[in-house]
Regions:
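Glycine-rich portal/gate segments that line the openings of hydrophobic small-molecule binding cavities
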Residues: 56, 91-153, 160, 173-175
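C-terminal segment of classical bacterial N-terminal signal peptides
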Residues: 4-12
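Glycine-rich loops and low-complexity Gly/Arg-rich segments
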Residues: 86-90, 99, 121, 130-134, ...
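Generic structural detector for well-ordered beta-strands
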Residues: 62-64, 129, 157
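Surface-exposed flexible segments
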Residues: 79-80, 120, 188-191
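Terminal "cap-and-tail" regions of soluble proteins that handle hydrophobic small molecules
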Residues: 15-42, 46-47, 52, 143-145, ...
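Hydrophobic ligand-binding cavity/cleft-lining segments
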Residues: 15-105, 111-118, 208
Length: 208
């Protein structure tokens, strides 16, 4: 859980204390998930945990990037680079950024998998800001822009692992309407019962 600075302390001390606590929690999570991450295949071993609470979907994704921490944070600190990453997903149609005094205004346009003009897609408006950036810990957030409470919050943190590797943690939440929860539960109870992500599990497979 990412912490904010506590009241009653000097601003610099508050930020440093919160960053130290968050880094310690990220390191503890990594040690717990390391066996799963190290078993992963591909260029970026990945572990995803999801849960639901009061109709809200909560997700945590952890990945090991085979790139030095300095290069990773250099890329992530600039919101414009997010517009090179996020549209790689098939549902993302476009991404724009505009500088603001409180951070960078970032707009994502999401729609159906097939071709769809950005003007027909749904816009999610965010303010992107970096909370912490030092040699051992990085944290940033995408928060709903003023007047757009429907944009789900996203928090990102990273830390170096050594050996030119970087641990990335993305936390997100999403509140869905009742009709969509019923439809989703019905799908995963029937047609999607053997699916994890995009993969179909074999009958004898174990979920790790």
């Amino acid at each position: 859980m990412l912490l904010l600075a506590a009241p009653g302390m000097p601003p610099g001390t508050q930020a440093a204390t919160a960053a130290e606590t968050n880094r310690a929690e990220l390191l503890a999570a990594y040690r717990l998930l390391e066996p799963r991450l190290r078993l992963g295949t591909g260029d970026a071993p990945l572990a995803v945990e999801t849960s639901t609470h009061d109709g809200q979907l909560l997700g945590n994704a952890y990945a090991i990037l085979h790139h030095p921490y300095g290069k990773v944070t250099e890329a992530l600190r600039d919101a414009r680079n997010w517009c090179d990453i996020l549209p790689l997903h098939m549902n993302m149609k476009a991404c724009t950024t505009r500088p603001r005094q409180t951070g960078t205004h970032l707009t994502l346009y999401a729609g159906r998998k097939s071709y769809q003009a950005p003007g027909q897609a749904r816009a999610f408006n965010y303010t992107y800001s970096v909370q912490t950036l030092d040699s051992t810990y990085f944290s940033a957030s995408l928060t709903a822009a003023k007047g757009d409470a429907d944009s789900p919050p996203v928090a990102l943190e990273a830390m170096p692992l050594g050996g030119k590797q970087t641990l990335i943690h993305v936390r997100y939440s999403w509140r869905t309407p009742l009709w969509l929860r019923v439809a989703t539960d019905s799908y995963f109870a029937t047609l999607g019962a053997r699916k994890v992500g995009f993969d179909e599990l074999l009958a004898t497979a174990d979920i790790v």
